[in-house]
From Swiss-Prot:
Function: Required for the formation of a threonylcarbamoyl group on adenosine at position 37 (t(6)A37) in tRNAs that read codons beginning with adenine. Catalyzes the conversion of L-threonine, HCO(3)(-)/CO(2) and ATP to give threonylcarbamoyl-AMP (TC-AMP) as the acyladenylate intermediate, with the release of diphosphate.
Pfam families per the UniProt record, alphabetical: Sua5_yciO_yrdC (PF01300)
A GO term from the CC aspect: cytoplasm
Organism lineage: Bacteria, Pseudomonadati, Pseudomonadota, Gammaproteobacteria, Pseudomonadales
Protein name (database record): Threonylcarbamoyl-AMP synthase
The enzyme's E.C. designation: 2.7.7.87
UniProt record similarity statement: Belongs to the SUA5 family. TsaC subfamily.
């Protein structure tokens, strides 16, 4: 586990507009403050990802997403709560409560409550984070810090060290309304 002072330093950097890399359950991720438009667009440019595709928000607990859930049916809340924390991402209506640099062209946003201890600690300090796999578009996701550094040397503001969570595949993505799997995990 990464020492708390390193996580605190990463949190401070994120609050200052940094784009950082960090280990997740299966692959390395890139992240930043979702409310910092400049940081999000810098992340998208680094990754060569079109804004239209949208991004995932991760959190350390479901309460960090409460602002989105005001009119949600109990069934939806139960679906999410029964799979979190863990490698389950849900597509939920954003109800125009999030900017397009997060949602892209979609009427939904992808949400996940992580069970990776380092990322949970980071989210507990800064709130929800943008999270996307650490790879340029069209390249395999980084599974090592070395690969992150090869992909993004000089382009990101830091790397929060640590180990991957041991999963082989990224999270499953499901639609909250239908339960349909959009991406297998």
């Amino acid at each position: 586990m990464v020492s708390s002072w390193r996580v605190q330093q990463a949190a401070q950097n994120i609050r200052a507009g940094a784009v950082i890399a960090y280990p997740t359950e299966a692959v390395w991720g890139l992240g930043c403050d979702p409310w910092d438009e400049e940081a999000v667009y810098r992340l998208l440019a680094i990754k060569l990802r079109p804004v239209e595709k949208g991004l995932i928000l991760i959190a350390d607990n479901i309460r960090q997403f409460d602002f989105l859930f005001e009119d949600f049916p109990e069934l939806w809340l139960d679906r999410m709560a029964s799979t979190w924390p863990g490698p389950n991402t849900w597509l939920v209506p954003h109800q125009n409560l999030l900017p397009e640099w997060i949602t892209g062209i979609h009427e939904t946003v992808a949400l996940r409550v992580t069970d990776h201890p380092t990322v949970r600690e980071l989210c507990a300090l800064v709130g929800p984070l943008i999270s996307t796999s650490a790879n340029p578009a069209g390249r395999p996701a980084a599974r090592s810090r070395l690969r992150v550094e090869q992909y993004f040397r000089g382009q990101i503001n830091g790397v929060l060290g640590g180990s991957l969570g041991g999963r082989r595949n990224p999270s499953v993505i499901r639609d909250i309304a239908t339960g349909q799997v959009m991406r297998a995990g």
